[in-house]
Design a protein with these regions (language model features):
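Generic non-transmembrane alpha-helical segments
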Residues: 143-151
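Short catalytic/ligand-gating loop segments at beta-alpha or beta-beta junctions
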Residues: 154-160
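Metabolite-binding pocket within alpha/beta catalytic cores that recognizes anionic/polar moieties
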Residues: 1-143
Length: 160
C-alpha cells in the first residue's frame, strides 16, 4: 500500500506561490459568486485570480485589513480555498453563505450566527475534531453580534 495513504499528514502542503498576494489575518470566505461580486465592490479592492477562485483585498493594502475569497462549491473546494488563504496569511476566517434549515420558524433571508455545526458533507471526517461538535469562535461571534445589533439587523444563533 502507498505510505502516503497510511498517514494523517498532508500529501501536498499549500504554500504561497509566485505572484500570490500576502493576506492579513482576517478573511471572509464567500460561497456565492454574486455575493462575492457585491462585497468586493463595497470599497476599492485589488483582485487576484487563483484559477478556480478569486481573492480580493483592499486597494493597495499589504497584509492588513479584511480579505475576501471565493466563490466555491462544496466542502472539498472550500477546504482547498481555506488551506490556500491560510498559506497566504489568513488566521481568522469566517464564511459568508447560505444554508438550509430544519427549523420551521426560520425563513429565507433570516440571519443565523452559527454556534456549532453538524458536519455531514464528507470532508470534515478527515479533520481531527474528535468527539466534540465543531464550534465557532465566541470572540468572533460577539463581534458579529455587536455589528448586526448596531445596524439594527435581527439575527438568530444556533447549530447549522
Amino acid at each position: 500500500m502507498n505510505p502516503a495513504l497510511q498517514s494523517d499528514d498532508a500529501v501536498i502542503q499549500p504554500r504561497k506561490g509566485k505572484g500570490d498576494p500576502a493576506l492579513g489575518p482576517d478573511a471572509l470566505m464567500v460561497v456565492i459568486s454574486r455575493d462575492l461580486a457585491r462585497l468586493s465592490k463595497l470599497k476599492p479592492m485589488d483582485g487576484f485570480d487563483q484559477g478556480f477562485f478569486k481573492i480580493f483585498r483592499g486597494k493597495g493594502q499589504t497584509e492588513a485589513g479584511l480579505s475576501l475569497a471565493g466563490p466555491f462549491l462544496g466542502a472539498p473546494q472550500a477546504a482547498m480555498v481555506m488551506e490556500k488563504i491560510i498559506a497566504l496569511g489568513a488566521k481568522r476566517i469566517c464564511l459568508f453563505g447560505w444554508c438550509g434549515s430544519l427549523q420551521p420558524d426560520l425563513r429565507i433571508g433570516d440571519l443565523v450566527i452559527p454556534l456549532h455545526a453538524i458536519a455531514e458533507e464528507g470532508t470534515s471526517k478527515h479533520y481531527p475534531i474528535g468527539k466534540r461538535k465543531p464550534s465557532t469562535d465566541t470572540g468572533l461571534n460577539r463581534i458579529l453580534e455587536r455589528a448586526l445589533e448596531h445596524e439594527g439587523l435581527p439575527f438568530r444563533k444556533g447549530t447549522v
